From Swiss-Prot:
GO terms for molecular function: calcium channel activity. It comes from the Bacteria. This is Uncharacterized protein HP_0920. It holds the Pfam family Bax1-I. GO terms for biological process: regulation of proteolysis. Belongs to the BI1 family. Keywords: Cell membrane, Membrane, Transmembrane, Transmembrane helix. The lineage of its organism: Bacteria, Pseudomonadati, Campylobacterota, Epsilonproteobacteria, Campylobacterales. It is found in: Cell membrane.
Amino acid sequence: MALYDRANSRNAYAEDSLLRESELVSFVKTTYKFFAGSLLLATIGALLGLMNFQAVVQYKWVFFIAEIAAFFGLMFSKSKPGLNLFMLFAFTSLSGVTLVPLLGMVIAKAGLGAIWQALGMTTIVFGLMSVYALKTKNDLANMGKMLFIALIVVVVCSLINLFLGSPMFQVVIAGASAILFSLYIAYDTQNIVKGMYDSPIDAAVSLYLDFLNVFISILQIIGIFSDRDT
């Protein structure tokens, strides 16, 4: 008779749905806590780096290699609670330090206000794209392949411009990168609220990289156009 007890079946389904919804809410909250912590530690890393500007510039490749090592350490420690959080914060702290040469260049050309301008613009973009991801009825998962192909194109163009050294080509690359990672913000945000990530740390590092790359792109554009004005 239990097979035909529709009330019990509905109650069990409702309880299961509520449980899954509660778990997802907890997942999203934890993700954004880790994301906020990552931004905070990156800011601290950048401030400490600016206070020791000459040393950071002199050993910038050492810090860059350390950042890459921390990133791969984070990837390999995904399934190790505690260690993965440590590697996340180590990576984000080092990424703040490696921003110092770019920050110093922009400050020298456009002043400290340009940093706040870039940060404000990045925050606005992040907020708008996050809201779009939550409000849209479109399934942004279909963008995944297109975004990945665009990412490869941007990386290849960036490598080519290392040899060309063209400021205007760099503006095009930075503009394309800003648009690309703005779209990634929406893409990753929707994936997070759909529960597509294995852990909050995976989700947080995706959001952090999106935010960081939009910020870097805007800084590069400001720096190049400030140079043209001088």
